[in-house]
Design a protein with these regions (language model features):
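Membrane-lumen/periplasm interface segments of specific transmembrane helices
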Residues: 1-63
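Signature aromatic-anchored transmembrane alpha helix within multi-pass, membrane-resident enzymes
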Residues: 1-2, 124-148
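Hydrophobic/aromatic-rich transmembrane helices and adjacent perimembrane loops
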Residues: 42-51, 102-124
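Hydrophobic, aromatic-rich transmembrane alpha-helices
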Residues: 48-77, 90-94, 117-118
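Membrane-interfacial loop-to-transmembrane alpha-helix junctions, especially the N-terminal start
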Residues: 71-86, 124-132
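A C-terminal functional module that forms or caps the active site or interfaces directly
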Residues: 75, 85-95, 101, 112
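Membrane-interface catalytic loops of GT-C/OST-like multi-pass glycosylation enzymes that act
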Residues: 95-111, 146-149
Length: 149
């Protein structure tokens, strides 16, 4: 919220830019595909760039929401849950806004480190296999998927 307010104070009126940006996004290739394609495609692209360890971490995060609300978790774990969980909510809001159609593997890169915090929630015995899965996934995507980056 602080960065948004800072930009507003500096003169950037996002509420004026949003409708124009929305219109520009829906020109071109985005107009060819239905919104549901982008809704699920964006999340799939994010899943590919984050890798399986993050998926596991987010799964653990989802199971710890109730203990978080009851303050039954240690402070470090609570901080990880809050940061990674907040970023997952930001991703959901960004996806629901329909403002990103394709290229989320580039546009959503700032979300990835925050989501990656969720890997700290994995049980210790899962961390080495999760790291191996991340490396294999990264190499497979880099070598088998054609991207323009």
């Amino acid at each position: 919220l602080v960065p948004v307010l800072g930009f507003a104070v500096a003169g950037f009126a996002w509420w004026e830019a949003y409708p124009v940006l929305h219109e520009r996004y829906w020109d071109g290739i985005a107009s060819i595909r239905p919104a549901s394609y982008w809704l699920w495609g964006n999340l799939a692209a994010l899943a590919v760039i984050t890798g399986p360890a993050v998926w596991g971490g987010l799964g653990v995060l989802a199971t710890r929401v109730r203990p978080l609300t009851q303050r039954a978790l240690p402070e470090p774990e609570r901080v990880v849950l809050l940061l990674a969980g907040a970023m997952m909510l930001v991703v959901i809001a960004a996806d629901a806004s329909r403002m990103s159609k394709s290229e989320v593997e580039r546009i959503w890169v700032p979300f990835v480190p925050w989501l990656t915090l969720s890997v700290a929630l994995l049980p210790p015995r899962w961390r080495s296999p999760a790291l191996l899965a991340q490396v294999v996934t990264a190499l497979a995507v880099q070598h088998l998927a054609y991207t323009t980056w």
